[in-house]
């Protein structure tokens, strides 16, 4: 499945999505879904920011047929919840682990990182444990971004445990925060007519 946060202006002229596919780019260029991020971006009319969810290479789409089936399934997605409020961001650091989050109505958006230390894909148990924790605290949904912003080794048990603690602390703090109306903006460099040198 694929999770999305959809932002739409009140006049419905501006539409933007944050997309967290439950698949993994790969296995390698140009095979299968190696460029799945770009394909999702194009499928959504270049108005999407595609994030790396908690997934690993077991979730690669190995053939172009599977990639096309997946892309076609995006058209069938429905908006499950609406709202126009969010909290201020919350950030929690435990040792090398960092979690940042926002709460949109009852949907939490979490960003997990060990940056500037490197890391490989987050293990699936991190996702399932955070999702269970969020469900127990009456969140509608939790979307988890593996920021994957520094390449490195497989995540150690200690770092994984710290990421879980940071994520849970972030969720607990978000529950105490006041929500506010917000505005969003989105720019696409394709519309800027940039000149390459």
Please annotate each region the language model reported.
Residues 1-197:
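Terminal domain-initiation and capping elements
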């Amino acid at each position: 499945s694929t999770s999305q946060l959809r932002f739409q202006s009140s006049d419905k002229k501006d539409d933007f999505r944050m997309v967290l596919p439950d698949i993994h780019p790969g296995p390698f260029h140009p095979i299968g879904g190696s460029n799945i991020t770009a394909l999702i971006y194009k499928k959504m009319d270049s108005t999407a920011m595609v994030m790396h969810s908690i997934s690993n290479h077991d979730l690669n789409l190995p053939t172009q047929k599977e990639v096309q089936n997946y892309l076609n399934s995006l058209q069938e997605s429905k908006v499950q919840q609406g709202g126009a409020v969010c909290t201020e961001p919350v950030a929690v650091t435990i040792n090398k682990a960092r979690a940042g989050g926002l709460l949109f109505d009852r949907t939490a958006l979490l960003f997990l990182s060990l940056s500037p230390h490197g890391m490989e894909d987050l293990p699936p148990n991190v996702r399932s444990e955070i999702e269970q924790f969020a469900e127990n605290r009456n969140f509608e949904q939790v979307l988890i971004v593996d920021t994957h912003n520094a390449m490195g080794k497989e995540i150690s048990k200690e770092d994984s445990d710290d990421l879980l603690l940071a994520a849970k602390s972030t969720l607990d703090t978000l529950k105490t925060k006041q929500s506010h109306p917000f505005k969003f903006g989105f720019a696409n460099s394709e519309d800027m007519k940039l000149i390459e040198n």
